[in-house]
């Protein structure tokens, strides 16, 4: 339990419930998306302990350093402390606001600090690529989560 308190204090990730307080319309769109149940997908496949799967299905899971060739969308998480486990950080399960918009702790502390602007297509393909998402078409799926 102490680890959780320390982690929460130091983590730049706040979770979607905090975002929802000020961004209810975006949250409503998210709740209808498959992103909102991404962790359950892993549990159903018994992959909820696989680091390669967790990297995209939870917020801020990055037990390794981003490579120099990684995109800015991936490198924004480098050195950040996000999801640890279902027991310790349940508020960071699923694909949430901070997966795409980056850590929001600074924004929560000061609303003048805005999340970094990113090209949505480049952020999406960090997870939706290759064998992980062979049928992914940005234009088709963007319409389902656009907010």
Name these PLM-found stretches:
Residues 1-147:
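Short sequence/structural segments immediately N-terminal
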């Amino acid at each position: 339990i102490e680890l959780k308190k320390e982690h929460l204090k130091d983590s730049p990730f706040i979770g979607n419930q905090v975002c929802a307080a000020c961004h209810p319309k975006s949250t409503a769109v998210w709740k209808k998306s498959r992103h909102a149940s991404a962790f359950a997908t892993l549990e159903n496949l018994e992959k909820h302990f696989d680091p390669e799967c967790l990297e995209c299905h939870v917020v801020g899971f990055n037990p390794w350093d981003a490579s120099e060739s990684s995109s800015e969308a991936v490198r924004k998480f480098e050195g950040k402390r996000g999801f640890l486990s279902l027991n310790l950080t349940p508020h960071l399960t699923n694909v949430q606001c901070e997966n795409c918009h980056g850590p929001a702790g600074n924004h929560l502390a000061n609303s003048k600090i805005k999340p970094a602007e990113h090209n949505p297509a480049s952020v999406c393909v960090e997870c939706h690529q290759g064998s992980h998402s062979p049928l992914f078409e940005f234009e088709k799926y963007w319409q389902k989560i656009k907010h």
